[in-house]
Amino acid sequence: MGIVNVTPDSFYAGCRFGPREAVDEVLRQVEAGADLVDIGGQSTRPGSDQVPVEDELRRVVPVLEALSGRVSIPLSIDTDKARVARECLSAGASVLNDVSALRNDPHMVEAALSAQAVILMHRGGDSPKTMQDCPQYRDVQGEVMAFLSERREAFRSAGGDPARVLFDPGIGFGKTLEHNLSLLKHLQDLARLGPVVVGVSRKSFLGSLTPDSGPADRLEGSLAGACWAALQGVRVLRVHDVRATKQALAALDAVLGAD
């Protein structure tokens, strides 16, 4: 799953695009081998503020409309707002990726019913602005799994097909370094719920493991995290660097398939 942020303030400067540039980037990622591309019009990095609905729509809807008929892979909309979800699903997106797990907007569960797939993510704290203030868990794995199971049930209770749900533990969203590493180590446990989505690409916890100068310095750690997640049975890897990740996974597959 490639990442395309139609935002001026994404944490990774290499993935900040205007609408026209975003279309080109989606096409580049498709050529590089992306199986799915996630398009977002609001940064959800730690400390970020909410973007008005109209601003978010102005960023992402033109991208989806411009891609209509030009790509054969599914497109995902990364939003926590029901109106944005509805309009983007009408404009060509088929997957809804909600970092609030359908909680931020009271109408989001209903909006999600028209998506072919729904990604529910765990986020500690009330919002991206405050989620890293003081993350605390007694049992991070158990609490994340219980939360995601409850959100799937909320979707099912509203008439949604639970088979359409994918689960994201929310690496870097309201978690300390230790929380992130524990969740990654035990991804196989999370996979008992269903298909898992993981995004470690360029995130700050990688910079805590080895000295770096920022997100641009974290490709190698991102590839290591992607390969580990794949070994744990993760179905969807959310990445900025599609070509490099595909190459790393191809090498991993070759080793695993050798006699």
Question: Where are the regions that the model predicts?
Answer:
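N-terminal glycine-rich anion-binding loops that anchor highly charged ligand groups
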Residues: M1-G2, R28-G41
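Active-site-adjacent loop and "lid" segments of alpha/beta metabolic enzymes
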Residues: S10-V26, T44-L67, V71-P74, T79-R83, ...
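Short acidic capping loops at alpha-helix termini that bridge into adjacent secondary structure
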Residues: D161-R164
